[in-house]
């Protein structure tokens, strides 16, 4: 039984299979999966939760929403025992978002008769968002090989970067990162990236820039002097807008911190396309795990 915990677990052929399904769904293909899914979210979410829920319902999958505050985890029940409960109740899928890193996970996944979908675990992984970003880029550019993609912002705490970079690497893209030195992880070289100290040089280099928000809820110390100084040094300002070719953001956008409030939705922005692509890509994930 398949699960999707990390984009690192996917082969090139599996990524291509998911993207093929996503393209078909976006073009209007209809399909029914007679199954049930628990959406277990113990962290706030708008786009991801609603996107997974709408994708499931369009496929005919019955959905049941459980928030962390409503579950027995607040009484001390382990995440594994919660999953065992879902298994015992006969659910087919569990889509989960949790504040901790779900690792190691392979033995746990093997022991459960469930299709698990990681919708974000701490700073670790968010594979569906990585696939959405990859699908959006591929849809726009056609060819990913040698494409220059720059991630800007809080790289250290970003599960979106950790999910998207391996997929882009797999298909031959060139990846750059830029942000405050305090927010660039020490092991960033394992992702095969170029590090830019100057965001303006990075923007000149890149075909598309993915801005990431400051993960303030995960920052246990002060990594930047102030949000205003961060925006001036790394944000998408009106001056930088003139130079940037295309840009993305997985959301939620912190306006006037990540991106100028007037520039979130423009002719150069693919942000709304990322949101729209959430439905076909997540439908594709459900189908991929079902087959």
UniProtKB/Swiss-Prot annotation:
Its EC number is 2.1.3.2. GO terms for molecular function: amino acid binding; aspartate carbamoyltransferase activity. One of its GO terms (biological process) is amino acid metabolic process. It comes from the Bacteria. The keyword Transferase applies. It is an enzyme of class 2 (transferase). Keywords: Pyrimidine biosynthesis, Transferase. The gene is pyrB. Pathway: Pyrimidine metabolism; UMP biosynthesis via de novo pathway; (S)-dihydroorotate from bicarbonate: step 2/3. Catalyzes the condensation of carbamoyl phosphate and aspartate to form carbamoyl aspartate and inorganic phosphate, the committed step in the de novo pyrimidine nucleotide biosynthesis pathway. InterPro entries: Asp/Orn_carbamoyltranf_P-bd, Asp/Orn_carbamoylTrfase, Asp/Orn_carbamoylTrfase_sf, Asp_carbamoyltransf, Asp_carbamoyltransf_Asp/Orn-bd. This is Aspartate carbamoyltransferase catalytic subunit. The keyword Transit peptide does not apply. L-aspartate binds at residues 75, 159, 213. It comes from Aquifex aeolicus (strain VF5). Heterododecamer (2C3:3R2) of six catalytic PyrB chains organized as two trimers (C3), and six regulatory PyrI chains organized as three dimers (R2). It catalyses: carbamoyl phosphate + L-aspartate = N-carbamoyl-L-aspartate + phosphate + H(+).
